[in-house]
Swiss-Prot record:
Record CDD domains: DEXHc_HLTF1_SMARC3, RING-HC_HLTF, SF2_C_SNF
Organism whose genome encodes this protein: Homo sapiens
Modified residues (Omega-N-methylarginine): 27
Biased composition (Basic and acidic residues): 348-359
Record-given protein name: Helicase-like transcription factor
EC number: 2.3.2.27, 3.6.4.-
Segments of this protein annotated with the region Disordered: 336-365
Protein location: Cytoplasm; Nucleus; Nucleus, Nucleolus; Nucleus, Nucleoplasm
Motif range (DEGH box): 557-560
Subunit structure: Interacts with SP1 and SP3 independently of DNA; the interaction with these transcriptional factors may be required for basal transcription of target genes. Interacts with EGR1; the interaction requires prior binding to DNA and represses c-Rel via a DNA looping mechanism. Interacts with GATA4. Interacts with PCNA; the interaction promotes polyubiquitination of PCNA through association with the UBE2B-RAD18 and UBE2V2-UBE2N ubiquitin ligase complexes. Interacts with RAD18, SHPRH, UBE2V2 and UBE2N.
DNA-binding region per Swiss-Prot/TrEMBL record: 38-287
Domain Helicase ATP-binding: 435-606
Stretch list, region Interaction with SP1 and SP3: 925-1009
Amino acid sequence: MSWMFKRDPVWKYLQTVQYGVHGNFPRLSYPTFFPRFEFQDVIPPDDFLTSDEEVDSVLFGSLRGHVVGLRYYTGVVNNNEMVALQRDPNNPYDKNAIKVNNVNGNQVGHLKKELAGALAYIMDNKLAQIEGVVPFGANNAFTMPLHMTFWGKEENRKAVSDQLKKHGFKLGPAPKTLGFNLESGWGSGRAGPSYSMPVHAAVQMTTEQLKTEFDKLFEDLKEDDKTHEMEPAEAIETPLLPHQKQALAWMVSRENSKELPPFWEQRNDLYYNTITNFSEKDRPENVHGGILADDMGLGKTLTAIAVILTNFHDGRPLPIERVKKNLLKKEYNVNDDSMKLGGNNTSEKADGLSKDASRCSEQPSISDIKEKSKFRMSELSSSRPKRRKTAVQYIESSDSEEIETSELPQKMKGKLKNVQSETKGRAKAGSSKVIEDVAFACALTSSVPTTKKKMLKKGACAVEGSKKTDVEERPRTTLIICPLSVLSNWIDQFGQHIKSDVHLNFYVYYGPDRIREPALLSKQDIVLTTYNILTHDYGTKGDSPLHSIRWLRVILDEGHAIRNPNAQQTKAVLDLESERRWVLTGTPIQNSLKDLWSLLSFLKLKPFIDREWWHRTIQRPVTMGDEGGLRRLQSLIKNITLRRTKTSKIKGKPVLELPERKVFIQHITLSDEERKIYQSVKNEGRATIGRYFNEGTVLAHYADVLGLLLRLRQICCHTYLLTNAVSSNGPSGNDTPEELRKKLIRKMKLILSSGSDEECAICLDSLTVPVITHCAHVFCKPCICQVIQNEQPHAKCPLCRNDIHEDNLLECPPEELARDSEKKSDMEWTSSSKINALMHALTDLRKKNPNIKSLVVSQFTTFLSLIEIPLKASGFVFTRLDGSMAQKKRVESIQCFQNTEAGSPTIMLLSLKAGGVGLNLSAASRVFLMDPAWNPAAEDQCFDRCHRLGQKQEVIITKFIVKDSVEENMLKIQNKKRELAAGAFGTKKPNADEMKQAKINEIRTLIDL
């Protein structure tokens, strides 16, 4: 039998639907006939240092100099205070001028002209990071001494030394002191930095000690005074569990706190920062917020909703209106094709649903909508989100993130009127366009009841006003920012947990016609939006409405999304104005300690708003194994973070009494034909890579190594996945420009068309506009362009350190990927050893208990498409969730799967990447992992989607691993990663040579060299 990938109109998704985290570069959604790929973890992300992290990992030495011009500037410093050096190239008197600033950014003075002449070249070419401390003489009138340390990459040491020699300066040995007192905690009675402490007295901790300390880092959070419980506001209907009451009490106390921030203390009339020794007269702003880092599945969303309703101003609950029960609610008849409020008028069934599952897509419903405003946006969504079993859905359309709303499967008790035609009928003359955002907002917040009949007050009118909100009014609105994938979950959670007669002004800021009036948005109780919308508005000309408002509270869901400080998304978040700030994340540190800085900067924790002070006082000392740095980190984390895991105990009982989770490995033996193909590809690849080892060029050919590993992993799943089109021969010096281009494009197609979850080694996120360098490494275009810009004029590849140039970056034309996919679409389908094992397990499970639901997970989305065929043939009802699906289809798929009625899907085909964020799939109690991931944390995140709050059955996970294959070797690497995970943030970062050697050893392990 022949088969094809054919689901939606081909070019519907080839568009700039979402903006990635890098500003104006769009994240493309490729046509659905492209091989399905969502990139993650082909390269283990922990193994690579980004350019800014690597830049100051080696201490070159120290230099004494002087700060002059003190009488001309208002900035002051204390003895032993850290200062920052800043280039001032536009200085009219000296193009080499270098400012000396205190922690507040106020200029204290400048370097003497001769010294500035030597250092300007080093700073401009980013050869070293130069850091200063004023050891004494802070009260001098004209000049003060400055002790400077030089940090950089080992390869730049000689260039720095030569530049200084040219100007008559010479670096001294590593200083006898570090410029901060390791014994000084942030609550001590003396200033932090002190030159009295010899550097050799610093305690260098072993990897094992650091691992133990990091294990304790979050454990200690459970043992202190965060055990007080608090009942939520009366408007909350769902009873809180004890750990949620504790979190509520802690969050309310943080929001109302009058304490000084960590590392600050008052001495007479001054406020001292004890780690930089900076002081000022103005009291530093309190940190009204923190990080709620509870494990996934412990109900952080409900806790956040409780905080919003419980703690408004002056410790009082949010003032709310009650809806009278005798209000009449109109219900109208909906014609079959009446509900298309935005996007394309398609009537297709859910992407990936089998025929039997189509019952999940019934007629959508929406309540009556009235226009009451003179604004083009007719009405804010000003009623409580409706309690429902189903979620609002969205569809991506051709020119922007347009939205379609509908209800999912339910037996409709009433009938609704054709909203579209009615809206048109009432619209002003000359405005016949349906206003999607009006219908969308109201659809989110009012719909036909699914259980009880509930009376909803129809909304407040939009009030005309100026763009600026009244500065004298105390802010009212909470802004919630989340990934698109969990937008519908927030709406559902508000509907589920708030009492039926409570009226909230709730607006979903999303879609092409969203209200952009700050005066109107600031009148809401809650505004909900996505990171992409926030970033898009931030990058457009004119003021972003969300940045024109001072919010009462900003909540970041999946807050680790801002971990990349260079991303436009992070900058957009950090620029928001708010009284209170919260980060919700189960993984505050994902890859390294540097992930924390953006979160601390978002919380406005002075002096860490400036990355330099975080790096100098905590990040670098901790990563170099310094005990004092670790102690500061522990104090900081303990102050601003609350974390409980599923194994945490409250009053002797587990926080969450979940059923047991068991993991089994089922070994698969390849058939003779599969083994023959596997061995042939392996032998050919080993010969080529062995030659690279002998020549010492293995990392220069890293794309070839990745290609071989991908092909071996694909054969383990299904030989159909094998990509033969790519030659393993790397670029040679004899290639013409056109031959080189073709070879590089072929290499990139190998990675992109594999259906794997590839990540960029710079930002550790999914590839955004992938490009390949002449040294055959694939990165996000905005990421690698930023590296090139930062390292001008001598930019080097972050992976192999070869020279790279922006002009030589190559993008893969989408039509080439399409052609490759079309060539394969008519092939005959055959099974594989893994598919046989899966089908045997599923069939056996159905015989024992036909109601048990299963997740079938793979990184290769093309493999999921292959699995669909035997599932259909065997009569299984299944649905699918992967990153290529529009949000509407995703929500529909999840709701169908979570439905417990007879005939609902018992299997979900899930891509590993799509299963990693914010989903609740607790209906499933069986997981079949078809192929191992490089990063075990990615697997664990996926497993947590079903092993979470609401799970009533024992969860059994089966990993299919092919015997005598690259998959068994991947398990060895996974185990190493698990062992290092707890201590990874505290262990000393490897230098470039150590990192390369570790990578080489890993390659040897994987291909048995």
